[in-house]
Amino acid sequence: MFIDSVNLTLSSGHGGAGAVSFRREKHVILGGPDGGDGGDGGDVYLIADNNSHTLAAYKGKRALKAQNGEAGSGRRMTGKKGENLELIVPPGTAVYDAQTNELLADLTKESERVLFLKGGKGGLGNVHFKSSINQAPEYAQKGLPEETRDVRLELKLIADVGLVGFPNVGKSTLISTVSNAKPQIANYEFTTLTPKLGLVEVDEYSGFVMADIPGIIEGASDGRGLGLKFLKHIERTKILLYMLDLANHRSLKEQFVTLRGEVEKFSPELAKRDFAIALTRMDAAENLERKVGEFLQILGLSGERSNLIDEAGKAGKNLIYKQDIYEFDDSKPYFVMPISSATNQNITELKFSLLELLKKGKFQMIFAGNLTETRG
């Protein structure tokens, strides 16, 4: 089961008490104090691990606690430190205060390790309290208390490309065509009920991670449909690929305006990310050239005919709008491309174009054969 949010009460370990003890040896009549210190309580760590994919391990658990430190003992023996509590979480996990929603930790990298709560310090044994006026102290410190915090763990998937579209627009079909992901595919809305990640190999040396997010409907930013539960998963994506259905009863303009509006309402910052547009089901569309031409005109791209790729003999190729990557205007889509996952039309061009945009992007890619550049 895909679990992307859990509430927990986390506690470190209580420090062990110091010991009150005196030397008791043969021929030593008045042995001095020899009480050892208490052991420190265990700490709480958060560790990001790529082998962890959901927060399901913590479902149904309300409280997790590190081990308490053991008490000290005679002969100046220090108590054993409490065992640490280590929470293994997927990269992309954010930790919030359950009451205030304050972000407390954000684990985005493999093997990232965060000390979240420090264990209580062990108390000092009575050996520390001997003085010239008190040769036999019968006092030792108690260990310091543990730290406790009510938290909410939220997983936000990390991907290079996030697919944004209405239900049943072909996102699952595309990701299964271009990557190793195998999502459930059927001809009804909300086939994808959990986000899926797929590794897209563009060539022998490079590729990227694509996220298939459950379909957005109008009002998603207000919680309708699958709503906010999954919109958050596109927050960490480097670029957005809006997918519009050429064979849908809604116009391309209506689809794009609605999707763009929902993303903007959810996060104005997210709406500023580099983006591109894929027009799906070109094999089933009527009046393909007219629909694409009208949509480009609506986007203010009709005067950019020099950016339309025209290659004879390849159906649909002459309908691809694409910017010059070195003169990229990020207020416009990098490309508008009709595709068909069913017939593989323009799929190769789509993969290479997305990789081009990622390599010119502002962020480092998760998976690539070469170091990526940053746009100046």
UniProtKB/Swiss-Prot annotation:
Q: Which GO terms describe its molecular function?
A: GTP binding; GTPase activity; magnesium ion binding
Sorted keywords for this record are: Cytoplasm, GTP-binding, Hydrolase, Magnesium, Metal-binding, Nucleotide-binding
Per the UniProt record, the lineage of the source organism begins with: Bacteria, Pseudomonadati, Campylobacterota, Epsilonproteobacteria, Campylobacterales
- According to the UniProt entry, what is the EC number of this protein? 3.6.5.-
Q: What is the official name of this protein in its record? A: GTPase Obg
Record's subcellular location: Cytoplasm
According to its UniProt entry, the protein's GO biological process terms are:
ribosome biogenesis
Q: To which protein family does this belong?
A: Belongs to the TRAFAC class OBG-HflX-like GTPase superfamily. OBG GTPase family.
Q: Which gene encodes it?
A: obg
The record's PANTHER family line, in alphabetical order, gives: DEVELOPMENTALLY REGULATED GTP-BINDING PROTEIN-RELATED, MITOCHONDRIAL RIBOSOME-ASSOCIATED GTPASE 2
The organism named in the record is: Campylobacter curvus (strain 525.92)
Query: Main localization of the protein?
Result: cytoplasm
Q: Provide GO CC annotations from the record.
A: cytoplasm
Fetch the PROSITE patterns from UniProt. G_OBG, GTP1_OBG, OBG
Provide the binding site for Mg(2+). S172, T192
Domain OBG-type G, which positions?
A: 159-359
